[in-house]
Design a protein with these regions (language model features):
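Active-site-proximal segment of zinc-dependent metalloprotease catalytic domains
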Residues: 1
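N-terminal Sec-pathway targeting helices
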Residues: 4-21
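Hydrophobic core
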Residues: 23-28
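A compositional/structural signature for long, glycine/proline-rich flexible linkers
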Residues: 29-476
Length: 476
């Protein structure tokens, strides 16, 4: 059917008008501005989460030793649990008045049984701390002073001698006057840890070593009168601190950074920490975190912990089956390395002591007490030390001693009655069961898998230069 031209024109106008109305309505519903706003919100959330994650990982690695130290300081200067192993108020010493055995090791991992331990937590925010050391008449002792950044300085035979001495622990910015004959020792942070060791040469020496250890004491400068203080300190009960693995880590890091001076070269890094509320120029409030920020920081905590754990398991180059780490106590800007070391504990500077460790024999097999082993030192292979050396065996699963029939947990150059061959060489017998002939050179080992740790106190330069290595561990 054909329509008149006039009707066709009217129909086209009607259709076009309807289409125009439809498109106008569609455009009104489409509103590109709302789409742009929605996409921008997603972008902002992604940026916030990513920034929190990436900066959070850096902050966690950087702050790991600080929070480990401040948490331990709180937990060992307050009563935080029943039957607490270690407790002493700030600026006081706790003394382990016994050699370490399987029954007395407590929470110590791979402890030595050659020295008496003593420790304390210092706070010199208000004033220096006096440290008194007695005349040990040449006896080996050392005090490792560890800052919150895990950097170490030493007092002791190697560094300051064995005559009676007075020291004052001071911050780099302290500018007061010390009494006569008091030597300043500068530590980077106003809070930190003291860990001391006093050599015991045998059971008959135990009482004298304890008496010398008792003569090491601490006293704030304002109370100093040349004598140890008998002032009683009230014990304080508190909740145990454990911030690792939680957002509380960042809150504690923020509080701690506010108390510390800016380290050279770290201004830009800490400015980044400010961006997520962790740096020293802002205040961290977990309740003010946006959901994307919280998600990013929680992800950062998990990944940073995994990074630290993986870093501790990186293979250390071994020679003759012995692994020797000499990169401890001074870290600079190597934050991941610092965190990985702290994960396993705090150590002395290598000039003070080195700890070659082994879990494999010369053929690459795990050490196990079901077998017998031998370590032989030719005369020229005997450990070159200015202090002393010893060898200990620990259960592999927990780094603890295992009881044995002769209560011997280390053997070394101070062990009474060692038998050397006619050329001056030394053979150590490592086995679980008592030897049939003689026990003079016997180091009892755990029944199952175990690790060996050799301790070299005041190692000579050829050890530090890698010119000396321990002999291989021979399976018999």
């Amino acid at each position: 059917m054909r329509y008149p031209a006039k009707q066709t024109t009217q129909w086209l106008k009607l259709v076009l008008g309807s289409l125009i109305i439809f498109f106008i309505a569609a455009l009104m519903l489409f509103n590109p501005a709302s789409l742009i706003t929605s996409q921008q919100a997603k972008n902002d959330a992604l940026i916030a989460e990513s920034m929190a994650y990436h900066i959070g990982v850096s902050a966690y690695l950087y702050g790991y030793p600080l929070i480990d130290m401040t948490s331990q300081m709180h937990n060992e200067t307050h009563l935080v649990e029943d039957n607490q192993d270690v407790y002493a108020p700030v600026n006081k010493l706790y003394r382990f008045n016994h050699l370490i055995t399987p029954q007395t090791a407590g929470n110590l991992r791979a402890p030595n049984s050659d020295t008496l331990y003593f420790q304390g937590w210092y706070d010199i925010t208000q004033q220096p701390l006096i440290i008194h050391t007695p005349d040990t008449q040449g006896r080996y002792f050392t005090i490792a002073i560890t800052s919150l950044y895990a950097e170490v300085v030493h007092i002791g035979r190697r560094t300051t001698g064995t005559k009676e001495r007075l020291f004052a622990l001071v911050t780099p910015t302290w500018s007061g006057t010390l009494p006569d004959k008091v030597t300043p020792i500068v530590t980077e942070t106003s809070k930190g840890w003291l860990l001391g060791r006093m050599l015991v040469t045998g059971s008959e020496d135990f009482v004298q070593a304890n008496q010398l250890m008792e003569q090491i004491w601490l006293q704030p400068l304002g109370e100093f009168n040349g004598q140890p203080s008998n002032k009683k300190t009230e014990k304080i009960n508190a909740q145990k601190y454990d911030f690792k693995g939680s957002l509380g880590f960042f809150a504690e890091l923020n509080r701690t950074l506010k108390t510390l001076p800016l380290r050279p070269g770290e201004a830009a890094l800490l400015a980044q920490f400010d961006e997520i509320g962790v740096g020293p120029n802002v205040t961290f409030d977990v309740d003010l975190l946006t959901p994307p920020q919280r998600k990013g920081l929680e992800h950062a905590i998990k990944d940073a912990e995994d990074i630290i754990q993986a870093s501790t398991q990186r293979s250390i180059k071994s020679t003759n089956g012995w692994m020797i780490s000499k990169d401890i106590g001074v870290y600079g800007y190597r934050y991941m390395h610092r965190a990985s070391v702290v994960k396993g504990g705090y150590g002395n500077l290598p000039e003070e002591s080195l700890y070659p460790a082994a879990v494999f024999d010369e053929n690459g097999n795990l050490l196990n007490g079901s077998d017998r082993f031998r370590v032989h030192f030719n005369p020229e292979q005997l450990p070159p030390v200015d202090g002393f050396w010893s060898l200990s065996a620990y259960k592999l699963e927990d780094a603890q001693f295992e009881p044995n029939s002769i209560d011997r947990y280390s053997i070394g150059n101070l062990t009474k009655g060692l038998t050397y061959n006619e050329l001056g060489g030394l053979t150590l017998d490592l086995q679980h069961e008592m030897p049939a002939d003689t026990t003079t050179n016997w180091l009892p080992i755990p029944e199952g898998h175990f690790m060996l740790v050799m301790r070299l106190y005041e190692p000579k330069q050829n050890v530090l230069d890698n010119q000396w290595i321990p002999p291989s561990i021979e399976r018999l």
